[in-house]
C-alpha cells in the first residue's frame, strides 16, 4: 500500500467516524436540502488540507462547516450567522411535559442566535468546552463564560418552568 492509498484509507475512516455527527450539526442550522452540500464542501476542504488536520478532527470539521454556513448566511444577507433549527411538536392530547417543552422552545427563540449556538454546541452536538471553543475560535475559558451567560439568559427567559435537563447542559 503506497502513501496515497494509506491517506485515502485514513480519510475514509475519518469520514465514516464523523459523517453522522457533522450532518446532524449542519441540519440543525439549515434546511435539510442544503445540508448535504455543506457537508460535502466541508469534506472537500478536509481532503485538501488533509496533511494539516489536527488530532481531534471533530471540532475542526464543525468549525469548517460553521464557516461555510456563515458564508452562506452572508450571501443571503441574513441577520445572524447561524440559526439553530428547533421544531416544537405539540401533541393533541397535551401529554405530560408538553407545556415545559413549549415554554423551552419559546425561551430558546427568545435568546440571541449567539446564545443558541453556544448552548447547541454542548446540548445537541455534545462537544466538550474545549471542542466547542475550537469550533467558535475562542479560548475554552471564553467559551465557558459565554456558555454560563447563555444558560443564565435561557433560564431567565424560561422562568420557573425550566426543565432540569437544561440545568445539566455542559457542567464539564
Q: How should these model regions be labeled?
A:
Residues 52, 62-84, 96-100, 149:
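Arg/Lys-rich amphipathic alpha helix in sigma70-family domain 2
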Residues 49-63, 140:
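Short, aromatic/basic-enriched loop-to-helix "N-cap" motif that marks the start
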Residues 3, 109, 113, 125-142, ...:
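Helix-turn-helix DNA-binding module
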Residues 2-13, 23-41, 49-55:
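Short, charged helix-capping/linker segments at alpha-helix termini
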Residues 118-122:
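A short pre-motif secondary-structure segment
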